[in-house]
Amino acid sequence: MIPLHLTKISEGTFELCHELRNVEIPNDSELQEIENIAFVEAKIKSFEIPPHVKRIGERAFCNCSIKTIFIPVDSELQTIERNAFDWSHIEKFDIPTNMINLKEGWCHGANNLQEVIVSPNNPRYKNYDKNIVIGQSTIESEIYDVLVFCNRKIEAITIPSFIKTIGTSSFENCYQLQKVEFLSDSELKEIKESALKETFIEKIKFPIHLTKIGQYAFSSCIYLQSIEIPANSELQIIGKFAFEGTKIENVSFPSCLTLINERAFRNCEELKNVQIPADSNLQAIEMGAFCVTPIESFVIPPHITKISKFVFDLCKQLKKIEIPENSELQIIDEKAFYFSGIENIKIPKQIKRISEEAFSIFNNLRKIEIPFDSMLQTIEKRTFTETLIDEITIPSNVTRFCERAFQSCHQLRLVNIASDSKLEVIEKFAFNEAPIERFMIPDHLKKIGKFAFSFCKNLRRVDISNDSELQEIERYAFEETSIVSFRIPSNAKRICKHAFYHCHQLQIIEIELNTKIEFINKSAFGQTAAIIMVPIEMIHFFN
């Protein structure tokens, strides 16, 4: 029995009370509020809302066994928060006169709810027909343009022309819903979060004036094969996960679309064809937007400045990427094309950054074109790891090869470095196991990291000019290469442990006059038969 003078059932009061089956409330109860998660997972079958209750909190009756809610005609109830009856078993619901805040998703997952009856005197909501409740976008509005609720057992629906917003979770989990139609004069502007998530619709044609499809709007609609967006559509935004896990086969985007949000088409296992018009205004394709899809080719729209993380991750059928000459693309982000099927790609001049693992672990990538005058400054970690490229051109502006940048590129034989290269650092494992045959050390290179060229067994020649600024060769840098001779430039300061370990073809090491060497590890040339030619003032390093 709820005490007569109790005004509030506090947050979580009866949460997880799995044996609670009955709640008695006095007829003249002073209760005014039922707070968040008050009765979560309770086994009560019915509940009468006292007349003075003004608010029911978020998830208050979530996962309850409740089937019947009694709300008196004179109820003062004004607000039902999000997910208040989430996954409950209610079958019928009355919206009283004073109800003005029926929050989005209030009956999410309540799949037995077939009838919602609105008081004729309610100022904000009304029944459109026996299946639909409509509402005003704000309490001040006089226009009923928001679809608030739909019968959870409905099989087909035509959205009234005057509806401008389909509210959050309006049709979510309507497992019998197979058909949604919009009239030619539809005024629909927005489909909100999870509006048709997990329905059984098979196709949909969007109205012209639609500007936004919210996150999860059609997510997990496993029978959805066809979406039609008119060429003159006003659609601007496709939200996160909007079509994730659908069976869409083709999609054509309108020119005015500006944003495809993260994972919008992830796991669309039938999506092979994506059409983007040449005059597209698309400005952002966010993280993982098309990951794990079988798309076969893609043209990067001209105004895209960044290909975000994981956008084409695991797109194993993706063979061709086209970047137009007027492209504004500047950044290819982390794992953007990770494990995809691209065979070749031409990097435009204005690209400034290719991030970690952007092209790594390709089974088919054989050719990548980068112009010498490219604005690219750094080749990040594992950018081209385990690709099949056989040649690479390094632009003059590149200052650093990060670790494992070309590791295990087992076809890479030729590295073209611009004569005016600004390269300063080659980090650890950068070319590990690559079969390159010759390498030119750029004049401004200061450091060769550990294992940088280790196990490059075809590497016989390393060219170093008289003007070289090379200062440090770290441990195992040239381990197990086939270098025949090597000249240590005068600016070199440190030759670390096992730098040339097991270089069995190495015959001559020449250390220049006027050298600045401060340290040579005793095993730097271990397991070689090289003759070391040193200035007389350096003999003490080898005594």
Go through the PLM ranges and name each one.
Residues 1-8, 18-33, 42-55, 64-79, ...:
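Structural signature of tandem-repeat unit edges
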Residues 143-145:
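Short coil-to-beta-strand
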Residues 10-15, 35-38, 57-60, 81-84, ...:
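Consensus positions within tandem repeat domains that build extended binding/scaffold surfaces
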